[in-house]
């Protein structure tokens, strides 16, 4: 039952860009509730929209499914549950390949740590898609809501990785510009959003961001995802969205390559002579260049 619920949830996450929010919000609660052991729920107050709640549920499922599996079998457990699923005859070959790329490039000294790194990358990719939907959702002016500072702070707290993985907070920042984008001419809406998105990346991560290999892929994925929101034929919407999600996931693997931690061998304490005689032990300075923690 749990497999069914969260496999459906994954494809509902795909629908975040491929279809209107109203169509999947009602479906999100239809699958049976999993039996014990229960999936840990999202922290109270963190999820503020249907999209965010769905992503939190997916994230919890990623961590819960393989929890009881031996470390070496965690990815295999995930792959069986997700990659081999076939919902409504949808082809997932592109996503299957992306999963493999991310897992193979995931950093981790042990199979379990490697899987945790994989979960991080895939979760951030999904958050990008959810954030993209919120930015591009076109609402009547009377229904347009500007995210409050409280919501933006909650989005920021939900990302605890290194700066290269705080994509959720980066995507959340341009949400405040969605009103301006929606008030722009129809042909200029994405241009307005794209400018806000790129500006947020540079402001949050600084100049070195431009040298990260994953940034071009990430920006391409956002454009691809946006294309799915304007496609008319359902089969075209899904195909374009799958391509966008695949690029987003692959971009996360590029980020992992850049952000691999630098592990330094511990240095022995230094013994320095004092002017009045004797000695003082000074601990070696630690290097702060390490990457994110898995």
Curated annotation (Swiss-Prot):
Matching CDD domains: Allergen_V_VI
Gene3D superfamilies with a match to the protein in the record: Group V grass pollen allergen (1.20.120.320)
InterPro entries: Poa_pIX/Phl_pVI, Pollen_allergen/Os
Keywords from the named record: Allergen, Signal
Segment forming the signal sequence: 1-25
Family note: Belongs to the Poa p IX/Phl p VI allergen family.
Name of protein: Major pollen allergen Pha a 5.3
Species, as recorded: Phalaris aquatica (Canary grass)
Classification lineage: Eukaryota, Viridiplantae, Streptophyta, Embryophyta, Tracheophyta
